[in-house]
Amino acid sequence: MSISNIIHGTCSPEYAALGNAFKENFTERNEIGASLAMVVDGELVVDLWGGVKDQQTSKAWEADTLVNVWSTTKGLTATCFAMLVSRGLLTYDTKVAQHWPEFAQQGKQDITVAMLLSHQAGLCGFLEPTSLEQLYDSSASAARLAAMEPLWPPGTAHGYHALTAGYLANELFMRVEGRSIRDFIAEELHSKHGLELYIGLPPEKAAQAATIMAQSGMTSSQAALELTTVQLAAMANPILSPTLPNTAGWRAAEIPSANGFATARALATLYGSLAQSGILNETQLVEPSVLAQATSPQISGVDLVMGVDIRWGCGFLCNSLNLYGTSPKAFGHSGWGGSFAFADPDRRLGLAYTMNSMGSELVGDPRNVAIMNAVYG
């Protein structure tokens, strides 16, 4: 099959290098199925997709193909909180226990919303053995975390809350807004703005979903460099298979830190709006002053779980080491395996990449590097 039959969509001529990098992900970097989108000044200038969404059936990746984006989901959750703050329903300085009294147990009474969203709460995982079935119960998981003693003094360090960030955020969100993050996204972003963004996979969207593929033996515990107690709790309790998103249990669950399903087009459109002072379809999703707070580093340094230097905003990854280009103002989130989405306010762009072939790199996936080099040179 020629590459012209693999790649579909549109790419403005001035971004031909980006289109070529996407094609080369298939011809040179073993991509299987993927989509790439970029919005500049509110205009969709790159909208490409290609390959297959299921290697066994050879079904083509289509314009509306959805795929699990793992922790790229966290950027959606961060955006939802920024929308709540913009609506005056809470502030980032608000103490979590003000809205969720049970959370104050075990010395957690002074943890703020900002601390919770920036992975400072010390609740990055469970110490007691945990099953997949327990992970799929968001409310019960949130209750366990509310009763838990932090793994480090809150506010003194940060450790990536890979899954638990979703339970914590969802429970707080419901206490404040009334709706779950899944329902909020469905109503405020999908229904109102047509964005193909979901927490979990709605049953009626099953035919659009890509099948995740990974190398044999790949697990979530490989993402931790040294399995300390904190890392074991965060990354290996339980150990997750990268193909878990293909299962009915995962798709039905509500884990707004990891089981988001999306198109690159929808992610790029959302981040494109955040790159333009929070305006989407002439609607002020997020106030500029709130966006500035949400994307300002709350804490930085070596992450206790990931073992690399990270700057955390209020749920967003703040740009460092040119992860999201050259602008220090850029922000976004990346997911296990290679998906990512970000905004660059200096260039007024939003970009997203989604795929179904799980890469093994913690940082520096060759597909991502090629895409970023094509944008920033």
Language-model features: locations:
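Flexible glycine/proline-enriched surface loops and loop-helix/loop-strand junctions
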Residues: 62-64, 148-155, 165-168, 247-256
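Active-site-proximal alpha-helical segments within enzyme catalytic domains
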Residues: 119, 165-172, 258-280, 339-356
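Active-site helix/loop module of the DD-peptidase/beta-lactamase fold
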Residues: 63, 68-72, 84-128, 146-147, ...
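Short, charged, amphipathic alpha-helices and their helix-cap/turn boundaries
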Residues: 48, 131-153, 179-196, 238-243
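Active-site SXXK
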Residues: 16, 22-23, 42, 65-94, ...
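Short, gly/Ser/Thr-rich active-site loops of penicillin-recognizing serine hydrolases
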Residues: 255, 276, 295-302, 361-377
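Active-site Gly/Thr loop motif
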Residues: 210-264, 292-347
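Short, conserved catalytic-motif segment at the N-terminal edge
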Residues: 6-69, 91-94
